[in-house]
């Protein structure tokens, strides 16, 4: 074979090889395209099935929180959560908040809180000691997490609020507007369903803790009128976010603010703040038809702040150190009562739980259990109740729980801001321990210097 023939032969082989390679590449591309088309087609075909499955799961997850069980028997309180939001907020993006509270559905517990439209250690945190402003909003995040823009859900524009879950959706109540004409906006599953206008034109306000749901209906207490005199108080019954009934309390010489409410055996009990003239706490209990009873916790172990030293109580308001007050709670067990209160009698510091076995009906100051929650040398603040339904816990009773706000900043500390973190505890019938779980942040922050 001469050189020219060799060149032609080699060239022919290369050409054939190239053509075969090209055909294989074209075949591979066609195979990929066909495979992708089939895969995409299958995706489109399966989407309705996927949505159906999702909706079915959602429907299965929806229950009606009955609220017909009694409170679980307990002998103490186990720590449930601590968010450390002020400590984390010295370097992280954490909201400036007040009035945190916890509420649980049958699937989860969430921390709700009133933001100031500002972050800690930022210039907009200046002046956030103010209670009512158009920048305040109700938001929520998973319980135990520091509230930040990255884990929080907007709920409502509000400087006073409540929220609860009926087993199907979240109900939120957000009050905003001017002092002389505020409006409560009710949302169900995030959609506005009703409104309540201030009826006394004097700072309409509500619980700053969870509302209470029984058999698909949810209940809340609102106040309108003076904070240092006779005001007007109403109970509202709501179904799927709409007010279906309300009643004004006939309660001369009583004063109800910032009630902490819970279901128990199909009825609702609320323990509130008397900002007018009582250092013991007023209560109102009612059934699902809003037929109610009223009173004051009789115990000589006084629950408000400021308050006198423990002594002889009264089933009416105890006037000694009775003016002003702080949001709080108690749990009734027959004639006995678990009382949550600050350790200090004149400042919002420290916190303790006390079991008075006859304190709901008797006026002596004897008690049998005291559990430390926060040392008197550390700041506390508001406190309130929440419950965990059997649909969440798997128990055959309603578990009582409470949260404590740990206020930091103004007016007691040298900062430009006011905010707080929170801790929570739930009742158990097993071993517990008393200790101090303070906020623990080192102040001032960089913005304060």
UniProtKB/Swiss-Prot annotation:
Gene behind the chain: NA
Oligomeric and partner information: Homotetramer.
Reactions accelerated catalytically: Hydrolysis of alpha-(2->3)-, alpha-(2->6)-, alpha-(2->8)- glycosidic linkages of terminal sialic acid residues in oligosaccharides, glycoproteins, glycolipids, colominic acid and synthetic substrates
Protein name listed in UniProt: Neuraminidase
Signal peptide coordinates: none
GO BP field: carbohydrate metabolic process; viral budding from plasma membrane
Coiled coil, from the record: none
Segments in the Intravirion topological domain: 1-6
Record text about domains: Intact N-terminus is essential for virion morphogenesis. Possess two apical sorting signals, one in the ectodomain, which is likely to be a glycan, and the other in the transmembrane domain. The transmembrane domain also plays a role in lipid raft association.
Transmembrane annotation, as ranges: 7-34
UniProt family annotation: Belongs to the glycosyl hydrolase 34 family.
Species name: Influenza A virus (strain A/Vietnam/1203/2004 H5N1)
Ranges for region Involved in apical transport and lipid raft association: 11-33
Regulation of catalytic or functional activity: Inhibited by the neuraminidase inhibitors zanamivir (Relenza) and oseltamivir (Tamiflu). These drugs interfere with the release of progeny virus from infected cells and are effective against all influenza strains. Resistance to neuraminidase inhibitors is quite rare.
Cofactor: Ca(2+)
Disulphide connectivity of cysteines: 72-397, 104-109, 164-211, 213-218, 259-272, 261-270, 298-315, 401-426
EC number: 3.2.1.18
Region (Head of neuraminidase): 71-449
Membrane topology: Single-pass type II membrane protein
Compartments in which it is found: Virion membrane; Host apical cell membrane
Residue sites binding Ca(2+) per the record: 274, 278, 304, 322, 324
Cellular component annotations (GO), alphabetically ordered: host cell plasma membrane; membrane; virion membrane
Post-translational modification: N-glycosylated.
